[in-house]
Amino acid sequence: MTILNKIVKVGNIEVANDKPFTLFGGMNVLESRDMAMRVCEQYVEVTNKLGVPYVFKASFDKANRSSIHSYRGPGMEEGLKIFQELKDTFGVSIITDVHEIYQCKPVAEVVDIIQLPAFLARQTDLVEAMARTGVVINVKKPQFLSPGQMGNIVEKIAECGNENVILCDRGTNFGYDNLVVDMLGFNIMKKVSKGCPVIFDVTHSLQCRDPFGAASGGRRDQVTELARSGMAIGLAGLFLEAHPDPNSAKCDGPSALPLSKLEAFVSQMKAIDDLVKSFEEIDTSR
């Protein structure tokens, strides 16, 4: 069965399941202005060299940290200043998450994509406020929700007048404190959303929690294998976090790619994407 492929425009980038993949990459949380500039510059250099469409990602507030003592970020006001400087300096589009209704309008005035966090994906008031900004929305699939249920969230956003939706898989609960990625789920999300672009958050899919700890562990030694598997499906994009020194990152370092490995990593992902999308589709439904 042929699946319709919708195109979502992000600046001059066309994001779609049958287009060359877009890299949504950056860092987990804004640690400082200088760190953000350094990371973004490296991503821009690599993606320009390889010819990969690119969107910078980072959070200004990690509002769902396990511990009240954990670093959350610089906050919305300072974060938006950093985002604007990145746009002015590098000409990048930007994606970031919102957690509160009041954040939607001011954030949407600066960034190009606002992200609906997985834990909040069914909160109707927040979904409605995000949708009414008119900007592109990236919906993280909740760890507790089946791929088929994502169609309901897309419909909710559409009912509020916004058709610019991207869906993102970031793993599914597998028992306690562990995640697994269902590779069949990507096509299910394509179908139930009537062709919305589907992307893969490989970084957060590698989380593995310490049941008694105050921070997430991770398995970055498996990031390449998992990302290769996802790219072989034929996706609209890959969501990736990198850090100059993952062991000292202020959030989710155990799942982050070392920044020094970025070019080799993205080069492999592009090779897989190019190959898969060169194939003629085989309809096995009949």
Curated annotation (Swiss-Prot):
GO CC annotation: cytoplasm
Gene3D superfamilies found in the cross-reference section: Aldolase class I
As its record notes, the protein acts as a catalyst of: D-arabinose 5-phosphate + phosphoenolpyruvate + H2O = 3-deoxy-alpha-D-manno-2-octulosonate-8-phosphate + phosphate
* UniProt subcellular location: Cytoplasm
This chain belongs to which protein, by name?
2-dehydro-3-deoxyphosphooctonate aldolase
* Annotated metabolic or biological route of this protein: Carbohydrate biosynthesis; 3-deoxy-D-manno-octulosonate biosynthesis; 3-deoxy-D-manno-octulosonate from D-ribulose 5-phosphate: step 2/3; Bacterial outer membrane biogenesis; lipopolysaccharide biosynthesis
A Pfam family assignment = DAHP_synth_1
Gene designation: kdsA
Q: Which terms does the UniProt entry file under GO BP?
A: keto-3-deoxy-D-manno-octulosonic acid biosynthetic process
Species classification = Bacteria, Pseudomonadati, Pseudomonadota, Gammaproteobacteria, Pasteurellales
Q: Keywords assigned by UniProt? A: Cytoplasm, Lipopolysaccharide biosynthesis, Transferase
Q: EC number(s) in its UniProt entry?
A: 2.5.1.55
